[in-house]
Amino acid sequence: MHKKLYISDVTLRDGMHAIRHQYSIQNVQDIARALDEAKVDSIEVAHGDGLQGSSFNYGFGAHSDLEWIEAVAEVVKHAQIATLLLPGIGTIHDLKAAYDAGARVVRVATHCTEADISKQHIEYARSLGMDTVGFLMMSHMTTPDHLAIEAKKMESYGATCVYVVDSGGAMNMHDIRARFRALKAALRPETQTGMHAHHNLSLGVANSIAAVEEGCDRIDASLAGMGAGAGNAPLEVFIAAAERLGWHHGTDLYRLLDAADDIVRPLQDRPVRVDRETLALGYAGVYSSFLRHAEIAAKKYGLKAVDILVELGKRRMVGGQEDMIVDVALDLKRREARA
């Protein structure tokens, strides 16, 4: 394969979920510096739930998005700074502030059937001259053909790249291939595609490889898999696999290995791995960032987190419905009392 893959690191955004959005300024600078020296193309920086995600519903961050972005801007020389915006949480005013702080790439994220709410934000990002990406979350919850229709909407608003986002880590390689084939058939040849995997079924790297084989241009990954649930595709593992396949990625594998083990892994207060709870996310198709919230609810109400997660999957809950986790826990508690 001759084209260079665009390597998009998400350790400082999706990785926020793994430590409940508590990175210090020193942490983000250490991680960003290591990623920059390893020559990744972009480094995404924000609260785990995007600009202005810091809240009662999602959890308060140790710092503001702008403090984190400005801190990263001080140390990077090669990589572009990316950020995430969920319409309804972040606004175009927040996007402008992020741009002023140093962000040059924005991923505008919606549920996979709600691309129409991204129009204002994508158009505004393009007017700022940002690298503007559409991000279709929970892509397993709709058909490949419908996902392509939603991707086409984002393209029409001005997105120059659209992502298949496996937020629940619920898809396999066949699911990924079907979605990329549908997107490639619907989108203009010049519109790029990207893959954002989660590792809940241990398929994060395999799914990313399948995506590239179907023509995907950009791959999201994180150091040591640092991310929601069982984490994202581990960056150093994907790069090692890409190297074995002879793919052009432009990054320094050994620097990534050192950063993953020496800087990122020691920060994990809960191991980022496939275990009973994170496997339940992938099996039940649940939004990966529900994990820590469900574990807190389970402890509070004397339940098993896995039972809460499976019930959330049955109810087809999506990102943004974190408040329903307590509702589900109370329902399960009532059921238990009646039994």
Curated annotation (Swiss-Prot):
First-level EC class: lyase
Active site location: H17
A biological-process GO annotation: catabolic process
Binding annotation for substrate: R13, D14, S167, H196, Y287
Listed Pfam families: DmpG_comm, HMGL-like
UniProt KW Lyase keyword: yes
InterPro entries in the cross-refs: 2-IPM_HCS-like, 4OH_2_O-val_aldolase, Aldolase_TIM, DmpG_comm, DRE_TIM_HOA, PYR_CT
Source organism of this protein record: Burkholderia vietnamiensis (strain G4 / LMG 22486) (Burkholderia cepacia (strain R1808))
Lineage top rank: taxon: Bacteria
UniProt catalytic activity: (S)-4-hydroxy-2-oxopentanoate = acetaldehyde + pyruvate
Sequence positions that bind Mn(2+): D14, H196, H198
Sorted UniProt keywords: Aromatic hydrocarbons catabolism, Lyase, Manganese, Metal-binding
Ranges for domain Pyruvate carboxyltransferase: 5-257
Annotated protein name in UniProt: 4-hydroxy-2-oxovalerate aldolase 1
Gene3D superfamilies: 1.10.8.60, Aldolase class I
Listed GO MF terms: 2-isopropylmalate synthase activity; 4-hydroxy-2-oxovalerate aldolase activity; manganese ion binding
Family according to the record: Belongs to the 4-hydroxy-2-oxovalerate aldolase family.
EC annotation from Swiss-Prot or TrEMBL: 4.1.3.39
